[in-house]
Amino acid sequence: MEDTMFLEKIAQTVADETSKIIGYQVSIADEKGYLIGVNDPARFGLFDKLSLEVIKQKKMLHWTPRDVVDLPGIFPGSSAPIIVNNKAIGAIGVIGKAEE
């Protein structure tokens, strides 16, 4: 099974279970930056250009309220790439104050 297909199959479960453990909302984006695992169903399928930036740069980034002011449905927090076989296949984000 292709890595990206695998991510699509587990994204929602990973987002839900991780959120329960850490106490913060979690989102997972596919390799094109679309949310495929989210705690708020209204956000499913949203394009998250910040996650796409994380995927392109292959590094963890942090977003402040100022960074997301013009991005409806996107929230401040931290996001890291999901890398398999040296390829960024998506990103996982944790919603909250970047300083936390």
List the predicted regions and their residue ranges.
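Alpha-helical/coil-rich non-catalytic "connector" segments in signaling and regulatory proteins
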Residues: 1-100
